[in-house]
């Protein structure tokens, strides 16, 4: 299934080029791999990885987007083909985004999905490990998020909803350490930080959020939506606000839960990270490959979509949510149904 196939290239010095209809990977003058381009939905290149113009053009024609990241996983650039989609759909998208009341309604649905999933994640950890000293605190944080969810209907404008999001984020990340089962001082999580991440947990979260952004943005573009024009996130030049909006539903249940799994199961530990002179904490090459492999495998897991009541791979959820948003904008649905984890 095309929407599950993202190629990650981490070998430094690798050169990607077109070989007939295939993508070829050359390292030190030797061709190591060949892949049919039409089977891919994305390519993500880390660090010193180069690509021929002919391959870039070929991938763009096949609707395969390419993202270039620094070796540590920071987003640098993106190459994509022409924008597709019905211009009428985009017009409706822009009109809705210009309507304060409609924007608030849409932002409320997105935020409801995010907070529901944050709450579900906290409750899952408390239920799975009731013997842990922090289980009571996790339940209390989940209850506080439930209270914030109940207040969302009373917020009539987007600024008030953003304030509620900030409050909920503080509650969630204050409780986050209680979901970590490791006690090593090197793995201590003292709050969300980025640019640069200052501890191993934040380093993994930042990398997973980058992967999530790639997949969500690609899904939105594939159905003809403009990833720059959002509802919950403010418009800003170069900022993919709609992609950031839709990401919110998936951060707690895909990226955050995966980070917890990688640490709690011992797949990552203190030795898998290095500290730069600036204080930035980055993954080793081997650790980065561990995260990539886990992400690929997770996208292949099957789940039941809560709105459609159909089973599908996790990797299809982003595309499905993009389709549901497009259906709402066309008037086929009364409201946008966020992804609610169970």
Where are these regions (language model features)?
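Active-site helix-to-loop segments that bind/position phosphate- or nucleotide-bearing substrates
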Residues: 1-17, 28, 34, 85-342
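Short His-Asn-centered micro-motif
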Residues: 45-48, 69, 192, 208
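N-terminal ordered "arm"
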Residues: 17-49
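A surface-exposed, charged beta-strand/loop segment in the N-terminal or early-internal portion
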Residues: 39, 47-120
């Amino acid at each position: 299934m095309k929407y599950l196939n993202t190629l990650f290239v981490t070998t430094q010095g690798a050169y990607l080029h077109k070989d007939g209809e295939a993508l070829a990977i050359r390292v030190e003058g030797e061709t190591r791999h060949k892949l049919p381009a039409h089977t891919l939905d994305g390519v993500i290149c880390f660090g010193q990885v180069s690509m021929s113009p002919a391959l870039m053009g070929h991938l763009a024609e096949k609707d395969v987007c390419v993202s270039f990241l620094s070796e540590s996983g920071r987003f640098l650039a993106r190459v994509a083909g022409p924008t597709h989609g019905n211009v009428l759909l985009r017009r409706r998208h822009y009109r809705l985004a210009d309507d304060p009341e409609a924007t608030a309604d849409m932002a409320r649905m997105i935020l409801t999905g995010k907070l529901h999933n944050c709450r579900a994640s906290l409750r899952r950890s408390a239920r799975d490990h009731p013997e842990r000293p922090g289980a009571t605190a996790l339940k209390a944080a989940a209850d506080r998020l439930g209270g914030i969810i109940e207040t969302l209907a009373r917020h009539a404008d987007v600024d008030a909803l953003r304030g509620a999001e900030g409050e909920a984020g503080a509650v969630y990340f204050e409780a986050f350490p209680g979901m970590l089962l490791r006690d090593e001082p090197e793995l201590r999580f003292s709050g969300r930080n980025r640019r640069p991440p200052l501890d191993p947990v934040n380093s993994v979260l930042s990398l997973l959020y980058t992967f999530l952004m790639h997949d969500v943005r690609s899904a939105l573009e594939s159905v003809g939506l403009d990833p720059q024009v959002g509802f919950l996130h403010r418009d800003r030049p170069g900022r993919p606000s709609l992609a950031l909006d839709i990401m919110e539903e998936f951060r707690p249940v895909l990226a955050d839960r995966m980070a917890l799994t990688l640490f709690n199961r011992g797949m990552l530990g203190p030795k898998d990270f290095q500290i730069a002179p600036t204080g930035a904490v980055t993954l080793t090459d081997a650790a980065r490959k561990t995260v990539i492999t886990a992400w690929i495998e997770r996208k292949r897991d099957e789940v039941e979509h809560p709105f459609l009541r159909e089973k599908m791979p996790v990797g299809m959820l982003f595309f499905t949510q993009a389709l549901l948003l497009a259906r709402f904008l066309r008037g086929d649905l009364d409201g946008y149904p966020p992804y609610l984890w169970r």
